[in-house]
Regions:
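Generic beta-sheet signal
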Residues: 65-67, 150-152, 181, 317-325, ...
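Short, well-ordered beta-to-alpha junction loops that form the rim of enzyme active sites
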Residues: 72, 323-326, 441
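Short internal beta-strands
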Residues: 67-70, 180-188, 440
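Active-site glycine- and acidic-residue-rich loops that bind
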Residues: 160-164, 296-306, 412-420, 424
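Long, well-ordered, tryptophan-enriched scaffold segments
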Residues: 187-408
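Cofactor-binding active-site loop characterized by glycine-rich and histidine/acidic residues
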Residues: 4-16, 20, 24-34, 43-176, ...
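Non-catalytic terminal/interface segments that mediate subunit docking, oligomerization
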Residues: 11-18, 65-66, 371-441
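Active-site flanking residues adjacent to catalytic metal/cofactor-binding acidic residues
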Residues: 156-159, 185-186, 323
Length: 441
């Protein structure tokens, strides 16, 4: 059953990546564009989170959970919602256009069950932390006990970790005993204007642990771990973990033959050591198999992701997942130094379409080109825990508010003093309004 589950999730991951990539391609190359200006859409940034979001939305998340999706992964989010039946074809076809699916997830403009608006980089991340604290406050007041507590999840672009409000939020979480919060860092190490500084993940790990978080580093997938267990494998592990981010990305873009040349040069020409085992490890793999192995980072490995997320559900401690990924994973843009705002060419999209057995004219079909029966995929989607209760837009009863408040009887006072007196008077009443006012400073 587990193998079948992984097979289905892998098929859905490929479909999600295709739909997201095609949505962006349609907006830039097919839809009428009188201005001639680039529409954009961040194909590479979306691709790096496709596996993580597949694991979460199709297998791990529950209806009570809430997710802040990093802004540039909105095409992946919309594709997932489309497969769930909670996004329309028309909205996808008008992505980044009038009345279309939004560039960045928007709770007010999108129709597909967005939990947090994340267009302002970094703010959605911190909002999940404070939402978790509010959930605890509501529970402490005895409200909402008829519903299970949810996890507040942020999917974070690694460059978002430059935003100062995130670090301020971490301190607040520590002060108030933060629980049930997951932050998943999409650690692809490439952004618009830089490559992430070497070793930054160790600083993240130390910082989060200092604030009481568990830290799970998802660096290697199962294929890599299996290779490390082979003779010569530990030397391959050491090379991967010491490889500079810029070099790893460049070799990813160049492909299997480039990987082979570099690995053989670096690992098999060292004096004073028998190079047989590590040479054999490399040479028994084809170029394609070697490229697949080197791309099998933890953030692209479904078994590793599922295990990590499901383990984290067994407790309520906050968890930071540092998921190593490749920007543009699964696309010809993978690893390219300029892929942040890059777009696949019509020729590249045609090759991808053919490789996925998607017929021309059927690009939007939900199950076109899938290797598993449509009824199997439909059944799996229908049974996904996340959508068990449909869309999750909830309402609460309106709290009565008096038309006017009694003005404090003082000959003169500051506005701060007056506001404090008003709050004091409200607090003395036995009303729903008094019970629900929260003051902050």
């Amino acid at each position: 059953m587990e193998n079948s589950r992984l097979e289905i999730l892998a098929e859905l991951q490929r479909k999600v990546l295709w739909l997201a990539t095609w949505t962006i391609h349609n907006a830039n190359h097919i839809r009428p564009n009188p201005s001639g200006l680039k529409v954009g859409g961040h194909q590479a940034s979306s691709a790096s989170l496709a596996t993580v979001m597949t694991a979460l939305y199709f297998a791990v998340l529950r209806p009570e959970d809430r997710v802040a999706v990093k802004p540039h992964a909105s095409p992946i989010f919309h594709a997932i919602q489309y497969l769930f039946g909670q996004q329309t074809l028309e909205k996808l076809q008008n992505f980044r256009g009038f009345k279309g699916a939004q560039s960045y997830p928007s709770r007010t403009k999108d129709i597909d069950d967005v939990d947090f608006s994340t267009g302002s980089v970094g703010l959605g991340v911190a909002q999940t932390l404070f939402s978790s604290l509010v959930q605890d406050y509501v529970r402490a007041k005895g409200w909402g006990t008829d519903r299970p507590e949810g996890h507040m999840v942020a999917l974070i672009g690694d460059a978002e970790m430059d935003e100062g409000n995130i670090f301020e939020a971490l301190a607040e979480g520590w002060k108030h005993g933060l629980r049930k919060t997951w932050w998943v860092v999409d650690y692809n190490r490439q952004s618009l204007d830089a490559v992430v500084r070497e070793g930054l993940w160790t600083k993240f790990e130390t910082m989060f642990r200092n604030f009481g978080w568990d830290v799970v580093v998802l660096r290697h997938g199962r294929l890599q771990e299996a290779a490390f267990a082979e003779p010569g494998g530990e030397r391959l592990r050491d090379w991967i973990e010491a490889c500079p981010n810029q070099l790893y990305s460049a070799l990813t873009f160049q492909g299997g033959a480039a990987w082979r040349r570099r690995l053989l040069n670096d690992l098999c020409k060292q004096e004073g050591a028998d190079q047989g085992p590590v040479s054999a490890l490399i040479e028994r793999r084809s170029d394609d198999a070697l490229a697949t192995l080197m791309g099998n980072l933890g953030g692209h490995d479904l078994p590793s992701l599922l295990e990590a997320f499901e383990q984290a559900r067994t407790h309520d401690r906050p968890v930071c997942f540092i998921a190593y990924t490749i920007k543009g994973f699964g696309l010809p843009l993978a690893g390219h130094k300029d892929n942040h705002a890059g777009l696949m060419t019509p020729e590249q999209i045609a090759i991808m379409r053919q490789s996925l057995s998607v017929r021309a004219g059927h690009e939007w079909d939900k199950f076109e080109g899938t290797s598993l029966p449509e009824d199997v995929l439909r059944g799996f989607l229908a049974a996904a825990p996340f959508i068990a209760q449909g869309t999750r837009r909830l309402t609460a009863p309106i709290i009565p508010v008096p038309d006017a408040l009694t003005v404090p009887a003082q000959p003169a006072m500051s506005t701060q003093h007056g506001f404090g007196l008003l709050m004091h008077e409200i607090a003395k009443t036995d009303t729903d309004l008094a019970r629900r006012i929260v003051t902050t400073s």
